[in-house]
A protein has these predicted regions:
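N-terminal leader segment of winged-helix/HTH proteins
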Residues: 1-27
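Residues in the recognition helix of alpha-helical DNA-binding motifs
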Residues: 12, 64, 127
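A structural signal for well-ordered alpha-helices, especially hydrophobic packing surfaces
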Residues: 13, 44, 98, 132-139
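N-terminal helix-turn-helix DNA-binding core of bacterial DNA-binding proteins
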Residues: 18-60
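Short helix-coil-helix linker/hinge
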Residues: 27-32, 91, 116-121
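A cross-family signal for key residues in well-ordered alpha-helices
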Residues: 35-38, 99, 125-126
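Canonical helix-turn-helix DNA-binding module
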Residues: 43-95
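Terminal interaction helix/tail motif
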Residues: 103-143
């Protein structure tokens, strides 16, 4: 019998996290810090949307961002629109870290692509992209 969507997605999440944890190595950065760094757009992001994007509560995000700030990878600044709102922005060192993370992610992508039968590569790529769009739509529908 084939696996249900839930079983496949659960296994996929675990396996994908395992690959990323093993293959992405950034000195002195935890996996959660790497995920946060890779999520912060170049223009910055407010704390609440960042917490939602990486799937943690605001208090956990605050501690995580404090550690990133202590490492010199981000700055926390008051939003110009509302001084009560905190924005997280990458420093130059944080931008460099983000570039390094992207390079390491690209290497993982290349390894996976090479592991897929040449004939099936486009189909696999399109299926992953389709799944990604479904997840984005689900996330947007929940706001």
């Amino acid at each position: 019998t084939s696996m249900s969507y839930g079983e496949i997605l659960s296994s996929f999440l675990i396996d994908l996290q395992s690959v990323f944890r093993k293959k992405i190595k950034i000195k002195n950065a935890s996996f959660q810090q790497i995920m946060a760094l890779s999520t912060i757009p170049s223009k910055g992001i407010e704390m609440t949307p960042l917490a939602k994007k990486i799937g943690i509560d605001n208090s956990t995000a605050t501690r995580l961002i404090k550690r990133l700030e202590d490492s010199g990878w981000v700055n926390r600044v008051a939003s110009p629109h509302d001084k009560r709102v905190i924005e997280v922005r990458l420093t130059n060192a944080g931008s460099n870290m983000q570039i390094e993370i992207e390079k390491q992610c690209d290497k993982i992508g290349e390894m996976i692509e090479k592991s897929v039968n040449r004939i099936d590569r486009q189909t696999v790529h399109d299926s992953i992209q389709s799944l990604h769009w479904v997840l984005i739509k689900m996330d947007l529908d929940n706001h």
